[in-house]
């Protein structure tokens, strides 16, 4: 038996938060294009909009007047149900893929930008 180091065992990602300038425009992108559902907020902050995927994973959109400058490697990653279909949809509606490729485990990925310039990764299922 392998001895576990002192650590907190995590099960899954609960939510990620993205800072946006226009929550309505961002909801069109995340709900309309990526399939999130708008759900009731569980906090008393009118500047945070809660979205959820069928898996239960959540995205919180925090609306501010000025979204902070972020390094290019900071992003949220979402697994596509069908990677090829997702790529075709993005091509069809004119959303450009900034970078794409295949990782060592065979997982394919592509990066796009949301309406506020936040980097978003769309990926296939992990190969591990």
Predicted regions and their residues:
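N-terminal beta-strand motif that seeds the catalytic metal site of vicinal oxygen chelate
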Residues: 1-24, 74-76, 126-128
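Vicinal oxygen chelate
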Residues: 2-9, 50, 87, 91-128
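Core segments of cupin and vicinal oxygen chelate
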Residues: 17-58
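Exposed loop/turn and edge beta-strand positions of beta-sandwich/beta-sheet ligand-binding modules
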Residues: 45, 72, 106
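Short glycine/serine/proline-enriched coil/turn segments at secondary-structure junctions
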Residues: 67-70
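Mid-chain, well-packed structural core segment of small domains
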Residues: 75-84
